[in-house]
């Protein structure tokens, strides 16, 4: 079993990386999330999380980011290959409880895994 940490090497941190994903990445969508994906030059899969102010106040935005990070941390082994992924929360995701957010992420990650190959 691998480490459950989420180190900086597995995070998208630079604005240029986010812009590259938004311009030329492929997208997968659910009702409450969008995933922008692109092959990575690094040797790991990196995750970025975007939750805009339209989603809610800081407490709600941080809750959504925390759940997304935790879900990725526990399920990153299901994603094969080296890619950059940006998970973008849609406006009404804050109306969901934690279980419903995880279920939506499960649907999104299934779409991401199906796009492997």
Swiss-Prot record:
GO BP field: tRNA 5'-leader removal
Enzyme class: hydrolase
GO molecular function, one term: tRNA binding
EC number: 3.1.26.5
Catalytic activity entry: Endonucleolytic cleavage of RNA, removing 5'-extranucleotides from tRNA precursor
SUPFAM superfamilies named in the record: Ribosomal protein S5 domain 2-like
Domain of life: Bacteria
Coiled-coil annotated residue ranges, if any: none
Alphabetical UniProt keywords: Endonuclease, Hydrolase, Nuclease, RNA-binding, tRNA processing
One cellular component term from this protein's GO annotations in UniProt: ribonuclease P complex
Subunit structure, interactors included: Consists of a catalytic RNA component (M1 or rnpB) and a protein subunit.
Similarity comment text for this entry: Belongs to the RnpA family.
Functional description taken from the UniProt entry: RNaseP catalyzes the removal of the 5'-leader sequence from pre-tRNA to produce the mature 5'-terminus. It can also cleave other RNA substrates such as 4.5S RNA. The protein component plays an auxiliary but essential role in vivo by binding to the 5'-leader sequence and broadening the substrate specificity of the ribozyme.
Protein name: Ribonuclease P protein component
Gene: rnpA
């Amino acid at each position: 079993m691998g480490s459950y940490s989420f180190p900086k090497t597995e995070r998208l941190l630079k604005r240029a990386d986010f812009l590259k994903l938004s311009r030329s990445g492929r997208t997968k969508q659910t009702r409450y999330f969008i995933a922008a994906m692109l092959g990575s030059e690094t040797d790991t899969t990196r995750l970025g999380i975007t939750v805009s102010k339209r989603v809610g106040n800081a407490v709600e935005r941080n809750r959504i980011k925390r759940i997304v990070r935790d879900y990725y941390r526990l399920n990153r082994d299901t994603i094969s290959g080296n890619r950059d992924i940006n998970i973008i929360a849609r406006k009404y995701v804050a109306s969901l409880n934690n279980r419903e957010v995880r279920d939506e992420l499960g649907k999104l990650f299934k779409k991401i895994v199906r796009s492997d190959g």
